[in-house]
């Protein structure tokens, strides 16, 4: 079958031909319709330090997708041929303390689809049926293909009660923009997103965010004053991994504020911890999605009117995958969809 693989320990992704995956007793065989390119896939393409330590070569990559069930393992219940599905990209062990307690998103033995085992950039994918999520009929293939990153946004945004709150989102990548849109949709008062990438800030404006701020040109405290905010942000969603952005967030949080961190900062990031202590801030780390509460919330948010369509900016045939990766690597894109039909 046709697949996009990391064939060499160097920059690039290559189209290749690989055997179809074998279906296990507890698995689903999924015919891929559409996939989306993730920031992780760009890291793998670039063959950065993380990728060199993590990714086996050769391997089919990718973990954002929607497809159709075409094969069902003999032990599987609850699915039928023709079901339209996406899937949780973190495959968990089922036997550690967190898994047994129902906190599978905190499994210490997680294996990543397209990271530690073959991924979805292929005509067919096999995953455990436990990881599959049926897509409601009124959600498009395009939106279903970005459920994985949308889940990161939803998990982060819904970590805290947002109704009537003032929310700061640092980092206007696709996940940050989606998190800001979720916050606005569920009843936050002011949602402010910051970045230095004007293209992506304009995407945020199209999503109806209260204020998209280019911190290279505007002062965040001036924006707060413009919005009538006198005591700081109630909730912070840190999506950038940029130390300067996190320090600004700490400066502008209200006392008792709550911060959810999805962005991955450098390991040696220094901050003024006295601000955390004396402001009484609560900081929560976010990884992946809650299984499967986040997935049901994603579907419900879209069905209740959340419009994510502006975040999808580029669509290509899989044969033009290089154009898709070029768009993602340029920083001048939202989500990029690759069609396998």
Swiss-Prot record:
It catalyses: L-threonine + NAD(+) = (2S)-2-amino-3-oxobutanoate + NADH + H(+). It is an enzyme of class 1 (oxidoreductase). GO terms for molecular function: L-threonine 3-dehydrogenase activity; zinc ion binding. Coiled coil: none annotated. Its cofactor is Zn(2+). InterPro entries: ADH-like_C (IPR013149), ADH-like_N (IPR013154), ADH_Zn_CS (IPR002328), GroES-like_sf (IPR011032), L-Threonine_3-DHase (IPR004627), NAD(P)-bd_dom_sf (IPR036291), PKS_ER (IPR020843), Zn_alcohol_dh (IPR050129). Homotetramer. This is L-threonine 3-dehydrogenase. It comes from Escherichia fergusonii (strain ATCC 35469 / DSM 13698 / CCUG 18766 / IAM 14443 / JCM 21226 / LMG 7866 / NBRC 102419 / NCTC 12128 / CDC 0568-73). The gene is tdh.
């Amino acid at each position: 079958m046709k697949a996009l693989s990391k064939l060499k320990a160097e920059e690039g992704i290559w189209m290749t031909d690989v055997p179809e995956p074998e279906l296990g007793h507890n698995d689903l065989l999924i015919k891929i319709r559409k996939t989306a390119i993730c920031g992780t896939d760009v890291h793998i393409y670039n063959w950065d330090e993380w990728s060199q330590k993590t990714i086996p070569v050769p391997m089919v990559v990718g973990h954002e997708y929607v497809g159709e069930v075409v094969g069902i393992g003999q032990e599987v219940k609850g699915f039928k041929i023709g079901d339209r599905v996406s899937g949780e990209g973190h495959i968990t062990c089922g036997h550690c303390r967190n898994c047994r307690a129902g906190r599978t998103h905190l499994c210490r033995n997680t294996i990543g689809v397209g990271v530690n085992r073959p991924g979805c950039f292929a005509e067919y994918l096999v995953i455990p049926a436990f990881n599959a999520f049926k897509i409601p009929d009124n959600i498009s293939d395009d939106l279903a293909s970005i459920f994985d990153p949308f889940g990161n946004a939803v998990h982060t945004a819904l970590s805290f009660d947002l109704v009537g709150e003032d929310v700061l989102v640092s980092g206007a990548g696709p996940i940050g923009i989606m998190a800001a849109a979720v916050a606005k949709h569920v009843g936050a008062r002011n949602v402010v997103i910051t970045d230095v990438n004007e293209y992506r800030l304009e995407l945020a404006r199209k999503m109806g965010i209260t204020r998209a701020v280019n911190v290279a040109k505007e002062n965040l405290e001036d924006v707060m004053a413009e919005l009538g905010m006198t005591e700081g942000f109630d909730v912070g969603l840190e999506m950038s991994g940029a130390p300067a952005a996190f320090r600004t967030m700490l400066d502008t949080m209200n006392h008792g504020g709550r911060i959810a961190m999805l962005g991955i900062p450098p390991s040696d990031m220094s901050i003024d911890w006295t601000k955390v202590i004396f402001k009484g801030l609560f900081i929560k780390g976010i990884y992946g999605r809650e299984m499967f509460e986040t997935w049901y919330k994603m579907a419900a948010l879209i069905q209740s009117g959340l419009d994510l369509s502006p975040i999808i900016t580029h669509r290509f045939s899989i044969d033009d995958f290089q154009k898709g990766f070029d768009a993602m690597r340029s920083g001048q894109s939202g989500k990029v969809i690759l069609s396998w039909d």
